[in-house]
């Protein structure tokens, strides 16, 4: 299992790099995005061109989740995402990316115990990638590879907005 966590930008981007590399080798990739519902992002738009080796599924609203007080809808969507991840894992994709799963746990959309149970059930031949800030120690301990992303410099801090095709 791979974990990309930390306060910096680029965690999803790193996971998508693995996805692209995997698809390039003819492998099957499934991405499950928690807390995301935008269809104008590059990883969503490319899905039709890379199918059937690449699938992406979103379990979030189009707007932002209130991290201090997530809605009941946000919690239900996250639970649906976790159930979907369980189902899709048994199709045995080569790579299963659980994007923003760490943050979904940190803000209380999902319980860590539920996530650990899912990870126990995933067939061993499926490579799992988990992204998001605030990865719990239990997930990092379980990982074969864990990376903490830290911004040294970021255009957003200068007031430069996110660029299509780069940050989304």
What are these regions (language model features)?
Residues 21, 46, 118, 138-139:
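Hydrophobic/aromatic ligand-binding patch that stacks against planar heteroaromatic rings
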Residues 131:
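Conserved D-loop beta-strand region of ABC ATPase nucleotide-binding domains
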Residues 1-3, 28, 94-95, 127:
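Residue-level preference for the first positions of well-ordered beta-strands
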Residues 135-168:
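Phosphate-binding/switch region of NTP-binding enzymes
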Residues 66-127:
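Phosphate-binding/switch loop-helix module in NTP-utilizing enzymes
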Residues 35-38, 62-64, 102-103, 134-137, ...:
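Conserved nucleotide-binding/hydrolysis micro-motifs of P-loop NTPases
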Residues 17-18, 44-47, 71, 110-114, ...:
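Short, glycine/charged-enriched secondary-structure capping and boundary segments
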Residues 2-87:
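Conserved P-loop
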């Amino acid at each position: 299992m791979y974990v990309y966590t930390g306060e910096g930008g680029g965690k999803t981007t790193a996971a998508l790099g693995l996805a692209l590399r995997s698809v390039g080798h003819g492998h099957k990739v499934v991405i499950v995005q928690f807390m995301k519902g935008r269809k104008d992002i590059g990883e969503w738009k490319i899905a039709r061109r890379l199918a059937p080796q690449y699938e992406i599924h979103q379990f979030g609203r189009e707007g932002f989740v209130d991290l201090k007080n997530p809605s009941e809808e946000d919690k239900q969507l996250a639970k649906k995402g976790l159930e979907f991840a369980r189902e899709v894992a048994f199709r045995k994709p080569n790579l299963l990316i659980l994007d923003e799963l760490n943050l979904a746990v940190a803000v209380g959309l999902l319980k860590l115990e539920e996530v650990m149970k899912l990870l126990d059930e995933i067939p061993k031949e499926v490579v799992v990638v988990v992204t998001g800030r605030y990865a719990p120690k239990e997930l990092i301990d379980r990982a074969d590879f864990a990376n903490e992303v830290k911004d040294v410099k970021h255009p957003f801090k200068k007031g430069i907005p996110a660029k299509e095709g780069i940050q989304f």
